[in-house]
């Protein structure tokens, strides 16, 4: 693995680090379409997957399956439209399906429909953000977001579309208008 804080590097440096790491994995046989296929996770995105793909293609130009050496890449690198939000959509669709089965809802000691629930999301990265957006944009109420640097809470609900705009400009969810900051975000998981 590679353990770095991507916030401490500029884009050019991150690209060099990522490609060098990828080349070493490729040379050692740990990364290929048939062996191990990286996907975006914490601290990585479509951008890094594109860099890894570029590194793979430069070392294995004759591999006709080179595009399959990573998943989660951008459409212009051979990725699939909708991939970015797919996991978050899956969370939303799973919740919808769960609430269609009243017997299962009752067994879980929950009442009402999905839109009757007050929901707290853990994480505001790709999965958390897109889960929250699908839930909110379909009538659900998100009352809290727990993130690594703290959380936010509003018992009446948070406008996820406005929060996303805020997060993209501030690089944090903290101090979002009309919410309370929660220092220890894990405490949020017990709020109602």
Task: For each feature predicted by the language model, list its residue ranges.
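Glycine-rich phosphate/diphosphate-binding loop of Rossmann-like nucleotide-binding domains
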Residues: 78-191
